[in-house]
Amino acid sequence: MERAGARGQRCGRRSHGLPLALRLALLLAGSPSGRAGAPEEQEIAGSGTVAPAGGDRCRGYYDVMGQWDPPFNCSSGVYSFCCGTCGYRFCCHDGPRRLDQSRCSNYDTPAWVQTGRPPARARDTAAPRDPARERSHTAVYAVCGVAALLVLVGIGARLGLERAHSPRARRTVTRTLTELLKQPGPQEPLPPPLGPPLGNCVQVQMGDGVLRGSPHNSTDKKRLNNAPLGSATPGPPRGPRLQGGGSLTLQPDYAKFATLKAAALKATEVAPQDFYQRFPSTETGPRTLPARVPRPPEDLPALLDACPWAPPGYVPPAGPVSSVPYAAWTAGRPARPLPRSHLVAQVSPAPRRPNHAPRRQFSVEKLPEAFSAQQASFYSSAGRGPRHLSTNSKAEVTV
């Protein structure tokens, strides 16, 4: 019995010692330096290494500069964890570095950023007005308006003076004076014409007895048969005076002349060819030389024999002269005496100048006949007609 009682006491003591041990263990686990809290930390770390589906989400926050950073999702590949600090957050792939966003408190606007609005300035509507100040403002406005008006008036006056003294205004005054000077004075009767009336004559240019038709394309001023021509004799000018208006009465002769002149100008403008149809001119045909009979070369000695200026030392051939036109041409003419120079040349047949052949001299009357054979041969070889030589005469001369 005693032994049983002793065992019961021991068990009671042990039962009282167990709650004390449990209490001590709980106290050690609650301390920060104890090892009892290690299993809880391992559980939190184990649950933080697993990323949620679709990536972690960083909440919006205010950074250290007081700027609001909007929220963002960490869903780019392996960067699916929200890491960093409460004032600077970013996405990372390391699960143990995951940020516990529930411990941060910078989700609201910081107090130092809220400076507040300045108080609105209350306008005192019951304050009395200052009449002196209002009068000063009115005086300033009036002075400025008067000054602006004076400036505008000065500018307008200057523009008016410049326009009045401009060259355009001077031209207007000059034009007015010209119109006044154009007013005609008392008209004087026109002097009578000095020459005979040439109203029905047509002037045709002629030269050396050959009519020259006036070409239709000439630039000379065409005159009609009813237009009077100017007199060849000098006289006073017969120009009309300036006519200022149509109310003045014109002289009968001048009115008739003006009417005829206007009709002539109108006729030349309407039908310029009518004048040539009414007064046709004689057109000359192409000028040609008369046909000449070529002379044989054996007639040349007879021509030289009849020429009084034969070259020195020339002896006419002895024999009968052939019956040619030269015989009849020289039969009725008296023989001319030889000049003294030819007598001296016959005495001394040697030429006066060395290296120079004696010149052959011909008579003016025999000169065309001497070159007739050469001209005929030249024209026949060239195959063209006679050559026209231009001279200063009005009629062309053909050789």
From Swiss-Prot:
It is a single-pass type I membrane protein. InterPro entries: Shisa, Shisa_N. Residues 1-36 form the signal peptide. Brain-specific. Highly expressed in cerebellum and olfactory bulb. Pfam families: Shisa_N (PF13908). The keyword Transmembrane helix applies. Keywords: Glycoprotein, Membrane, Signal, Transmembrane, Transmembrane helix. The chain crosses the membrane at residues 137-157. Glycans are attached at residue 73. Residues 158-399 are cytoplasmic. It comes from the Eukaryota. GO terms for cellular component: membrane. Interacts with AMPAR subunits GRIA1 and GRIA2. Belongs to the shisa family. This is Protein shisa-8. It comes from Mus musculus (Mouse).
